[in-house]
């Protein structure tokens, strides 16, 4: 397992805490990707969550792939298109095959328990 860079250590001895900075939503848009890339390049971010189903996922990956970071899956069921066949998850997608928004999902859960 990759050792993450500690950005800040707070407290002393047994009561100390370490802060590791993580960025989420890599792949959401080119603007988000570039912001995360800048933070990774400057050493502020050492852990990144990637939205693999989003249109700009490949762009984001190409920006950060050569850095020594922890790159993880950001599970996403409320934006973009699913990686699986939308017909298999009809309660999660709209007619156009894209995921329902979090607001729509919340409404559906409220109505259907």
Model-derived features with residue positions:
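Short, Lys/Arg-enriched N-terminal segments with co-localized hydrophobic residues
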Residues: 3-16
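Active-site mouth loops of central-metabolism enzymes
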Residues: 18-29, 108-113
């Amino acid at each position: 397992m990759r050792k993450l860079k500690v950005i800040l250590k707070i407290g002393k001895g047994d009561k100390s805490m370490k802060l590791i900075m993580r960025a989420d939503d890599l792949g959401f848009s080119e603007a988000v990707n570039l912001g995360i890339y800048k933070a990774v390049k400057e050493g502020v971010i050492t852990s990144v969550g990637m939205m693999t189903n989003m249109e700009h996922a490949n762009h984001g990956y190409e920006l950060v792939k050569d850095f020594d970071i922890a790159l993880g899956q950001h599970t996403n069921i409320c934006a973009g298109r699913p990686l699986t066949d939308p017909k298999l998850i009809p309660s999660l997608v709209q007619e156009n095959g894209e995921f329902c928004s979090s607001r729509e999902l919340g409404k559906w859960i409220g109505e259907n328990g």
